[in-house]
Amino acid sequence: MTWDGLPTQPLLMLLMLLFAAGSESALAGCPGCGPGVQEEDAGSPADGCAETGGCFRREGQPCGVYIPKCAPGLQCQPRENEETPLRALLIGQGRCQRARGPSEETTKESKPHGGASRPRDRDRQKNPRTSAAPIRPSPVQDGEMGPCRRHLDSVLQQLQTEVFRGGANGLYVPNCDLRGFYRKQQCRSSQGNRRGPCWCVDPMGQPLPVSPDGQGSSQCSARSSG
């Protein structure tokens, strides 16, 4: 099963192995924390690499959940149109980027460039009667703004803390599609050799009625296609 089917993987063991690998790679770069990484304390390069948390990644540099974190004001995010955003962050294939809010994206799309009015607006001024039909809002363009993607971002921010507190058993990491909405099947992480429970949801994450035979993902696909 792919990375999107997280319940088939021993998630906690994988996270700890990734953390150990990230720590070794950070320490191997001492002094100076390695290329593309800045130290918290520029006055003591060796001390900056004494621990994994002592190094910061600059904007545009690779990052992940358990490797040196991004510098203040930056956030580790998957690349645009990344098919498996969780996997990318776990294996350190994210990028340090400046956090973008919904208002910022909306402002960019709503303001015309150079102060020029849009052709549709000019047509309305010439022919007011032709603008009677309401304009339908365009679908979500940025997958990061989907409900599942917002949920995933909040989980990733808390993931490292929960693992070290021992509270990550049965962890639920939302399974998102490319547009940031929920995939049909959602599952909790595996617990030892036992697979975590799964359930079916709609694109907004609302649980769907349980099928009588409870056949997991096949039933989710069949129900959505019917």
UniProtKB/Swiss-Prot annotation:
GO MF annotations, alphabetized: fibronectin binding; identical protein binding; insulin-like growth factor I binding; insulin-like growth factor II binding
Annotated Basic and acidic residues bias: 101-126
Stated name of the protein: Insulin-like growth factor-binding protein 6
Domain (Thyroglobulin type-1): residue spans on this chain: 145-220
Chain segments carrying region Disordered: 92-148, 205-226
Native organism taxonomy: Eukaryota, Metazoa, Chordata, Craniata, Vertebrata
The gene coding this protein: Igfbp6
Gene Ontology BP annotations: cell migration; positive regulation of MAPK cascade; positive regulation of stress-activated MAPK cascade; regulation of insulin-like growth factor receptor signaling pathway
Functional description taken from the UniProt entry: IGF-binding proteins prolong the half-life of the IGFs and have been shown to either inhibit or stimulate the growth promoting effects of the IGFs on cell culture. They alter the interaction of IGFs with their cell surface receptors. Activates the MAPK signaling pathway and induces cell migration.
Record domain IGFBP N-terminal: where: 26-99
Residue spans of biased composition, Polar residues class: 214-226
PTM field: O-glycosylated.
Keyword Ribonucleoprotein: no
Disulfide bonds: 30-33, 49-55, 63-76, 70-96, 148-176, 187-198, 200-220
Origin superkingdom: Eukaryota
Protein keywords: Disulfide bond, Glycoprotein, Growth factor binding, Secreted, Signal
Oligomer and partners: Interacts (via C-terminal domain) with PHB2.
Signal peptide range in chain numbering: 1-25
Any Gene Ontology CC annotation: extracellular space
Localization per Swiss-Prot or TrEMBL: Secreted
